[in-house]
Design a protein with these regions (language model features):
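Conserved GNAT acetyl-CoA-binding A-motif
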Residues: 113-123, 292-303
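Conserved acetyl-CoA-binding loop of GNAT-fold acetyltransferases
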Residues: 136-146, 297, 316-325
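Terminal substrate-recognition subdomain of acyl/acetyltransferases
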Residues: 155-177, 316-317, 321, 326-331
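Active-site acidic-Proline motif in GNAT/NAT acetyltransferases
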Residues: 91-93, 126-127, 272-274, 278, ...
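Acetyl-CoA-dependent GNAT
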Residues: 37-94, 104, 110, 166-168, ...
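Conserved beta-strand-loop-alpha-helix junction that forms the acyl-donor binding cleft
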Residues: 122-132, 149-154, 301-311, 328-331
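Conserved N-terminal entry element of GNAT/NAT acetyltransferase domains
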Residues: 1-15, 32, 161-187
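Conserved acetyl-CoA-binding loop-helix of GNAT-fold acetyltransferases
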Residues: 96-110, 132-137, 268-271, 277-290, ...
Length: 331
């Protein structure tokens, strides 16, 4: 999963996040609200195994603000259509700023829209009135109170409050028409196939001697969506997908003079013609940079046609610099 809205990002936890999760989970001040004032006492090795386990029913997510990790979320299926979620803002300097409600809303919207979920549940401790206020403001409905249902780390009996949310109950704390970015799902293949020809057509007009109007190979799209280390990030307003960025992790080739680097390659960036000029290209580039950083890339690389001045200006504004020039001689 990869979601981006404003300065906030929700992304899959990766192996490189194990040490950070270990620090948070072993911190009693972070875990006290969950009933573990002494921390979990876990290890980086155990967390690495959990993240690596494809059979683990818990989907672990990292929360970022301005590309800085600030906390974590998770969700797991109780049944095919019901997801249980949890959230912790772990860095104290990012707490009580209203970020939690936005992040919960981002995740709930995504689960309802693109993951087949029709019901979301969560619980919190009875004394956590602030969390209850946040949940109820987002549309969650209290479904019950379980008195003295578990003992915390100190042996104290605790009472839990249960909540549920249905799609029609979700109250977004932001304008639902604001542009945002999410990672593509298999069901998005058709819209991606429809946008691709607009990119190829524009490129063919710039360099018709080398590029022609065409459709993209559906197998290429499917592999990028489903294979690890690859992604298609979609720019969306409301329910309408308006553009995408295709990115994958790779490595410098094994050539003796090359300094070895893991890096991300932005293969394609496309925005529908009618939606251009509204900042969607910038939004996608920023999301791709965040994706690349999270995946351990040392840098993000892309190519541009030499006469595509609009694209070149965009890339330079976003911090890209020229590295290699390709020369071609007609024979």
């Amino acid at each position: 999963m990869y979601l981006a809205l404003h300065k906030l990002t929700i992304r899959d936890a990766l192996l490189a996040d194990a040490s950070l999760l270990c620090k948070w989970w072993n911190d009693g001040t972070v875990m006290a609200h969950a009933g573990f004032p002494q921390g979990l006492g876990t290890s980086v090795e155990k967390i690495t195994q959990q993240i690596s386990d494809s059979n683990d029913p818990t989907h672990r997510l990292i929360l970022e603000c301005q590309n800085t990790p600030i906390g974590e979320m998770c969700y797991r299926h109780q049944d095919p259509n019901t997801a249980e979620i949890g959230i912790k803002i772990c860095e104290s300097n990012w707490q009580e700023q209203g970020l939690g409600s936005q992040l919960i809303a981002m995740l709930c919207r995504e689960l309802f829209a693109n993951h087949g979920i029709t019901r979301i549940v969560l619980d919190t401790m009875l004394e956590n009135h602030r969390a209850q206020h946040v949940y109820e403001k987002l549309g969650f409905v209290k479904t019950g109170i379980r008195e003295n249902c578990w003992r915390d780390q100190t042996g104290k009996l605790r009472t839990a409050v249960d909540y549920q949310l249905l799609p029609q109950q979700l109250c977004l704390p932001f304008d639902e028409e604001e542009p945002w970015v999410r990672d593509a799902q298999p069901a998005d293949q058709t819209i991606i196939e429809e946008i691709y020809p607009t990119l190829f057509e524009a490129m063919s007009q710039l360099q018709p001697q080398y590029i022609q109007a065409a459709k993209q190979n559906p197998d290429f799209i499917r592999k990028i969506i489903t294979e690890n280390g690859k992604d298609i990030l979609l720019a969306q307003c409301g329910e309408q997908v308006l553009g995408f960025g295709v990115v994958l992790m790779t490595h410098t080739p094994p050539y003796n003079c090359f300094v070895p680097h893991p890096y991300a390659d932005l293969l394609d960036l496309a925005v529908l013609p009618a939606a251009r000029g509204n900042g969607l290209g910038t939004l996608l580039l920023q999301a791709v940079k965040g994706w690349a950083k999270a995946h351990g890339a040392d840098y993000l690389e892309l190519g541009a046609l030499s006469n595509n001045q609009g694209a070149i200006r965009l890339y330079e504004r976003e911090g890209f610099g020229e590295c290699i020039k390709t020369f071609r001689a007609s024979l």
